[in-house]
């Protein structure tokens, strides 16, 4: 049986509001996180990803109250990331109602965190987020702190290392494509998908429904994440699922 591919709307949150930017900058308000999460649940989203995009760079605490409010209204799997620095942060997020926890900047400063968290809570709830940008030498470099800090790490090698330490999924964002609506970086997505055996969630650049199809068929992603096309009413999740299903992709249709 073919495993169904997933559509995951992404809620980037700062100061308690959902926002959307271009290339990780120029943030525009998109609404209240609880309202938006409820709408996507009603539309049949497979999961939601909730990223506190300024938590790490600002050093702010986890926004547990918002997560508790969202989790009380939403009954699909919820991945939450942003500001996760210790195994205890993972515990607090899971207790607040998250099903999975995203680790990004802290995975680089402390890779042991990925191992320890996956050992304690299981790989299935540890998602490592990789924000990658094409470098001058043709490889993809990993960035942290909301895309502000270069690491010198190769994205493909880093994904392999994270898998070996116990990550259950990779959330792979092309910073070059973020918010541009020109489609995923399919070379990046396919290169990482081919290099590891855990699921890859493609992120960054969706402008239309065909981009979602391409992420799966060409990029070989297991799930596709999008924000702009859903937040501003361009498409519903149901439309996206139907379109992907019509293109021969196994989807959970509601």
Curated annotation (Swiss-Prot):
Q: Report the GO molecular function annotations.
A: imidazoleglycerol-phosphate synthase activity; lyase activity
Q: Name one Pfam family in it.
A: His_biosynth
| Keyword field contains RNA-binding | no
Q: Main localization of the protein?
A: cytoplasm
State the GO CC annotations: cytoplasm
What residues form the membrane-spanning segments?
none
Question: What CDD domains has UniProt attached to this entry?
Answer: HisF
Superkingdom of origin: Bacteria
Pathway listed for it is: Amino-acid biosynthesis; L-histidine biosynthesis; L-histidine from 5-phospho-alpha-D-ribose 1-diphosphate: step 5/9
Q: What is its EC number?
A: 4.3.2.10
Task: Report the sequence similarity comment from the record.
Answer: Belongs to the HisA/HisF family.
Official protein name in the record: Imidazole glycerol phosphate synthase subunit HisF
- Which organism is this entry from? Herminiimonas arsenicoxydans
């Amino acid at each position: 049986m073919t495993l169904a591919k997933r559509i995951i709307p992404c809620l980037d949150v700062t100061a308690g509001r959902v926002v959307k930017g271009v290339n990780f900058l120029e943030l525009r308000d998109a609404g209240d996180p609880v309202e938006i999460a409820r709408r996507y649940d009603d539309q049949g989203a497979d999961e939601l990803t909730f990223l506190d995009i300024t938590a790490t760079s600002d050093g702010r605490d986890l926004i547990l109250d918002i997560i508790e409010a969202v989790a009380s209204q939403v009954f699909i799997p919820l991945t939450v990331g942003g500001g996760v620095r210790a195994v205890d942060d993972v515990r607090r997020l899971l207790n607040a109602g998250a099903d999975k926890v995203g680790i990004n900047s802290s995975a680089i400063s402390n890779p042991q965190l990925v191992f320890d968290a996956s050992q304690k809570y299981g790989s299935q709830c540890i998602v490592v987020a990789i924000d990658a940008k094409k470098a001058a030498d043709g490889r993809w470099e990993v960035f942290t702190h909301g895309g502000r800090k270069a690491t010198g790490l190769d994205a493909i090698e880093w994904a392999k290392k994270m898998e070996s330490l116990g990550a259950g999924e990779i959330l792979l964002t092309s910073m070059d494509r973020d918010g541009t609506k020109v489609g995923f970086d399919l070379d990046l997505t396919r290169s990482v998908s081919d290099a590891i055996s855990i699921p890859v969630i493609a992120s960054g650049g969706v402008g239309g429904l065909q981009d979602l199809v391409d992420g799966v068929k060409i990029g070989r992603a297991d799930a596709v994440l999008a924000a702009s096309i859903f937040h501003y009413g361009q498409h519903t999740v149901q439309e996206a699922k139907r379109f992907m299903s019509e293109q021969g992709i196994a989807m959970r249709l509601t």
